[in-house]
Amino acid sequence: MLKPEVDSLVPHVPFSRRKFVQAALGGTFAAAVLPVSAQTITTDAAGLDVDTVQIRSGDASVPAYRAQPDGKSNLPVIVVIHEVFGVHAHIADICRRFAKLGYLAIAPDLYARQGDPSKHASIQELIAQVVSKVPDRQVIEDLDATVRWAGKNGGDLSRLGVTGFCWGGRQTWLFAEHNPHVRAAVAWYGKVAGETNEMTPFNPDDHAAQLKAPTLGLYGGKDDSISQRSLARMRERLAAAGTQAARESEIVVYPDAGHAFFADYRPSYVKADADDGWKRAIAWFRHHGVM
């Protein structure tokens, strides 16, 4: 189910896949990717309070990267849902970008129970041993716990937004269909349709009528992993839903972009479309009261 997305993120040049996975979750991330892309964005932490925190979710402790303006409270909240490779330097950087704009941004490690991605020697092994074993139900519970944590630690849950990328883009749609506290959501190249199983019993387009927050979907027209037909069907289901959140939702397709066009650390990065998508995302959150 995830192979095209994975292939689109892995450059077609010789390099160690073990090194890539380890670097993605570790401190040597930048060193591993800078030779691939000189456009990698690094946002400093000046004026910010950044840390890894522990969030209690059921019987588990879920680590999360958190960034917010230093010394501030009662902040709007953005939950950042990681891509297929987990919480790595790019996801942390996105949190800092939001924090620079005045948000409490937090990215929980939604693979925490299933294992450490850096321990797997290949992308295929990572998918088989970790990603495929993460049930949607667990993800929703951990995201709910993250929201509660933010509300008790300086966040204003009346101004709650969620955004996610790749694997996390799909989860963004699902969470916006689940949690009534979400004011707005932005899903970056997340699947809206696909195979179902015990771990993923339904897809976003199955529950479009249950959408509780206006959601902006940002997609690439050349994304081999997400068909334009599935996006057209999602638009149709949103239009037919009749709810305000569904009516206000929007799907934008960048014709010349592929999957992961926002991932500035990969060759898939398309700067013009990434910049436009970021501007749209920030405007979306502000328009819907997440500021």
Give residue spans per PLM region:
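N-terminal secretory signal peptides
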Residues: 1-15
